[in-house]
Curated annotation (Swiss-Prot):
Role description: This protein is involved in the repair of mismatches in DNA. It is possible that it carries out the mismatch recognition step. This protein has a weak ATPase activity.
Gene Ontology molecular functions: ATP binding; ATP-dependent DNA damage sensor activity; damaged DNA binding; mismatched DNA binding
One Pfam family hit: MutS_V
Protein name per Swiss-Prot or TrEMBL: DNA mismatch repair protein MutS
Taxon lineage: Bacteria, Pseudomonadati, Pseudomonadota, Alphaproteobacteria, Hyphomicrobiales
Gene3D superfamilies: 1.10.1420.10, 6.10.140.430, DNA repair protein MutS, domain I, MutS, connector domain, P-loop containing nucleotide triphosphate hydrolases
Keyword rRNA processing found: no
Family, per entry: Belongs to the DNA mismatch repair MutS family.
Native species: Rhizobium johnstonii (strain DSM 114642 / LMG 32736 / 3841)
CC per GO annotation: cytosol
Keyword DNA damage: yes
InterPro entries assigned to the protein according to its UniProt record, in alphabetical order: DNA_mismatch_repair_MutS, DNA_mismatch_repair_MutS-lik_N, DNA_mismatch_repair_MutS/MSH, DNA_mismatch_repair_MutS_C, DNA_mismatch_repair_MutS_clamp, DNA_mismatch_repair_MutS_core, DNA_mismatch_repair_MutS_N, DNA_mismatch_repair_MutS_sf
Length: 908
């Protein structure tokens, strides 16, 4: 009997178990376990024993803590108790889900022979077992373990060095849908590309994993990054490995790939082969992505804008949640993919917009399509499970239902003149095999079991031999009912019943008090053979009942054999059409996304953006797509729409920059974010929340909005702000869109103002990008006098009877106040503190009026023409003395500027 033991006990590690001494002292069963565990040291080993998967030693300690299950012991090994825990086989998926979500990897070890076969090899022979599958976060296919709306990518990263340069490449595979893509990348954008694709598991050579230059990337990814032996990423054998997987002699028909891309793709394929053991998922041919084909969004921007999840990790409140009107799993995944990877090709963007516009103009068709799509199961994932021999009757049914719905969608679309994208989708739907749908419809029953081993999934009439066996089974049931009546009359025991269990099979049961007619005479004893006595009942059998049981058992076995053979034939027929099914499923997803975005545009009054290769950025009455919907749900009144025009001014080639000032709580951050989100929506191929929008392609989007520290990496809030700002200033191009909110606020006033001033100049003169720059440094507004493409804008307010009303409207001009004290009063600061703050503010403003910031603009040349003069020893000495005497943190902005004038005089 298993006894509970202390979960804090130490246990043998995998390395300790693998020693010769350990193996020599193990029982035959434990020796087998140790050998299998030694081959899978980085995985929890689910060791099959009857109806349970059991875990031992260190695995048991980890699993019991992670799963919250009882830790017991099973005998001893080398004088120590063996920790053990287990999970039922029928509930294994639930436990796997939790372990995978916690980042564990699991090796599933099954019995590959039954005990009877083991005994033939010797009375003490151990049943043969082996690992049939490695379950890792990036290689799962079970429906319970997957999110219907999210892809489940395995990604491989590799690096090839040559001609003084290191080329990085990524390959990513979703074995649950067959998606297979690859792309080159650079160290500077590696994290951004990984987060864009959002893999569940990233494999990489251990040499890269320990590279100091890339360590910050893997620190962010945490347990997602899994180092592997470098041999897995060998570029010399890469092409051959991929060709063998797809059964082709050459990859010439797949396209042209770099050595780094091939190495990454081959590593991903090798890892799939390693984890799936003997099975092979039906992967699509590898497709190459170009970095220039998608809008670059750096990691900080992706997080700040809360595209797929909020900063707290919640899907609710994200842009994806706000725009998702899809009704299929494939559609939801495609929508997320498009949102995370907006395009930079106007032609492809406009093709998507054409589809949405067409369905808006055809509301009846759009509604009918969505009604049909609601009944489309997840065909790609059902296909993958069937191909990997993990499927069941309901997966076959999913293929049948999907093919049937696809036929209905094709009929609807076939009656219309379609735009390009929908026309291509229709062609793929029309290419689906009608004979396969007919086969499945004529073969599968209406009500289906979860597991094929349960049988009963073939409809009556589908197989003549099966019908005969079922008739025998049904006839036997009638015979049993007749025997029960016969035995009751023969013995005079009206309560006599014929029952069945897995131990005795069929048996006669009577109460102990009524059993005498079956036990008193020799004839009765010969006829009714005693099987079992219980507290209140006795059980018997007869020769004819035993014969009938044998016939029924044989019929059931024969029926299941027939059904399993039919299942294998149907599965083979489905897998043979894998490419067509995946293409058809993708077409349904495209239609679902277009119909969902059409519905969104209609219900939220979105407009079609004009997207082209210009540098325009003109938004009329733009709104924040997430905040607007939240206000409607909360009955909080209408969202205040605002214009934004960063288009090149007359005579200029480059876009404009708005310097936005205004009060706290005035809506600056919302305005900044909404314009970034509108650009993303437009380039993903969606209508946008505005009355009109003209957007020239943005190649890179940067958003520095909000503030947070990074304590784990020893970074203060200000340091994080500066790192992110540095990335923007170093990477933004003249086609980029830059959104900056209150740069410099995290340090002393003088320092912060100086940094913000220089950043605005750099964006204008060096980056020459389109941008929105929000600030509370009102001194910066004087820059509009010297920077031709810089305009001032402000959040309007109204003062009424001592109170301030935030209008949330953007207009031209500069704010003269930030109304911070009014906000402090609204927040509940003590009245005495508010009064004192007003007094201090009045004194500071009086001092500031004596030395207006406009004087500073004449004394500070633009950074790009400023020539740093060599300081004389005498001048430098005076400046140093003056600087040492200053207390910068105690200075007001006005005092800081006065100090600048004095320092300059000392340098002359």
């Amino acid at each position: 009997m298993n006894a509970r033991i202390d979960t804090g006990n130490e246990a043998f590690s995998a390395a300790e178990l693998a020693t010769a001494e350990s193996r020599a002292s193990a029982t035959p069963m434990m020796e087998q376990y140790i050998e299998i565990k030694a081959n899978n040291p980085d995985s929890l080993l689910f060791y099959r024993m009857g109806d349970f998967y059991e875990l031992f030693f260190e695995d048991a300690l980890e699993a019991s803590r992670a799963l919250g299950i009882t830790l017991t012991k099973r005998g001893q090994h080398m004088g120590q108790d063996i920790p053990m825990c287990g999970v039922p086989v029928h509930a294994a998926d639930d436990y796997l889900q939790k372990l995978i979500s916690l980042g564990f990897r699991v090796a599933v070890c099954e019995q590959i022979e039954d005990p009877a076969e083991a005994k033939k090899r010797g009375a003490k022979s151990v049943v043969r077992r082996d690992v049939v599958r490695l379950v890792t976060p990036g290689t799962i296919t079970e429906e319970k373990l997957l999110s219907p709306s999210e892809s489940n990518y395995l990604m491989a990263l590799t690096r090839i060095r040559g001609s003084g340069e290191a080329l990085l490449a990524l390959a990513w595979i979703d074995i649950s849908t067959g998606v297979f893509r690859l792309a080159e990348t650079e160290a500077s954008r590696l994290l951004a590309d990984i987060l864009r694709i959002d893999p569940r598991e990233l494999i990489l050579p251990d040499t890269i994993f320990h590279d100091p230059e890339l360590k910050p990337v893997f620190d962010v990814l945490g347990r997602t990054a899994v180092p592997q032996p470098s041999v897995l990423f060998d570029s010399a054998s890469a092409e051959g490995r991929i060709a063998r997987y797809f059964g082709v002699a050459t990859l010439d028909g797949f396209g042209t790939f770099s050595r780094a891309e091939l190495a990454a793709a081959a590593a991903a394929v090798a890892y799939v082969e390693k984890t799936q053991i003997a099975e092979r998922p039906p992967l699509g041919k590898p497709e190459r992505e170009s970095a220039a084909s998608t809008l670059f969004i750096d990691p900080a921007t992706r997080a700040n804008l809360e595209l797929a999840r909020t900063l707290s990790g919640d899907r609710n409140g994200s842009l994806l949640k706000a725009i998702d009107r899809t009704v299929t799993g494939g559609g939801a995944r495609l929508l997320a993919e498009r949102l995370m990877s907006p395009l930079t090709d106007p032609a492809r963007i406009n093709a998507r917009l054409d589809s949405i516009g067409f369905l808006i103009d055809e509301p009846l068709l759009c509604g009918n399509l969505r009604d049909t799509l609601k009944h489309v199961p997840d065909m790609p994932r059902a296909l993958s499970r069937l191909a990997l021999d993990r499927g069941g009757p309901r997966d076959l049914s999913a293929i049948r239902q999907g093919l049937d719905a696809a036929g209905g969608v094709a009929v609807m679309l076939g009656k219309a003149v379609l735009p390009e994208e929908l026309g291509q989708a229709l062609s793929e739907l029309q290419a689906l095999p009608a004979t396969l749908e007919k086969l499945l419809a004529e073969t599968l029953a209406e009500e289906l079991p979860l597991l094929k081993r349960d049988g009963g999934f073939l409809r009556d009439g589908a197989n003549a031999e099966l019908d005969e066996v079922r008739a025998l089974r049904d006839q036997s049931r009638r015979v049993i009912a007749g025997l029960q009546l016969q035995y009751a009359e023969e013995t005079g025991i009206r309560s006599l019943k014929i029952k069945h269990n897995n131990v005795l099979g069929y048996f006669i049961e009577v109460t102990a008090g009524n059993a005498s007619p079956m036990t008193e005479t020799a004839d009765a004893k010969a006829r009714f053979i005693h099987r079992q006595t219980m507290a209140n009942a006795m059980r018997f059998t007869t020769t004819e009942l035993a014969d009938l049981e044998s016939r029924i058992a044989n019929a059931a076995d024969q029926a299941l054999t027939i059904e399993l053979e039919a299942f294998d034939r149907m599965t083979a027929a489905v897998v043979a059409e894998a490419e067509a099914i995946k293409s058809g499923a993708r077409a349904l997803a495209v239609i679902d996304v277009a119909a969902g975005l059409a519905l969104l545009a209609e219900e939220q009054a979105y407009c079609r953006p004009q997207v082209d290769g210009s540098k325009m950025f003109a938004i009329e009455s733009g709104r924040h797509p997430v905040v607007e919907q939240a206000l409607r749900r909360q009955a909080g009144g209408p969202f205040v729409a605002n214009h934004c025009d960063l288009s090149p001014k007359t005579g200029d080639r480059d876009g404009a920059i708005w310097l936005l000032t205004g009060p706290n709580m005035g809506g600056k951050s919302t305005f900044l974010r909404q314009n970034a989100l509108i650009s993303i929506l437009a380039q993903m191929g969606s209508f946008v929340p505005a009355t009109s929008a003209h957007i020239g392609i943005v190649d890179r989007l940067f958003s520095r909005v909000g503030a947070s520290d990074d304590l784990a990496r020893g970074r203060s809030t200000f340091m994080v702000e500066m790192v992110e700002t540095a990335a923007i200033l170093n990477q933004a191009s003249d086609r980029s869109l830059v959104i900056l909110d209150e740069i410099g606020r995290g340090t002393a006033t003088f320092d912060g103002l100086s940094i913000a001033w220089a950043a605005v100049e750099h964006l204008h003169e060096a980056n020459r990008c389109r941008g929105l720059f929000a600030t509370h440094f009102h001194e910066l507004t004087v820059l509009s006098e010297k920077l031709g493409r810089l305009s001032n804008a402000t959040m309007r307010v109204k003062e009424w009877d001592g109170d301030v009303i935030f209008l949330h409207e953007v207009g031209p001009g500069a704010a003269d106040r930030s109304y911070g004290i009014q906000v402090a009063r609204l927040a509940g600061l003590p009245a005495s503190v508010v009064a004192r703050a007003r007094d201090v503010l009045t004194r500071l403003e009086d001092a500031d009026r004596k030395n207006p910031a406009s004087q500073l603009i004449d004394d500070l040349p633009l950074f790009q023409v400023a020539v740093r003069r060599e300081e004389t020893a005498r001048g430098a000495s005076k400046v140093e003395e003056a600087l040492k005497a200053m207390s910068l943190d105690d200075m007001t902005p006005r005092e800081a500027m006065d100090a600048l004038y004095d320092l300059k005089k000392k340098l002359k």
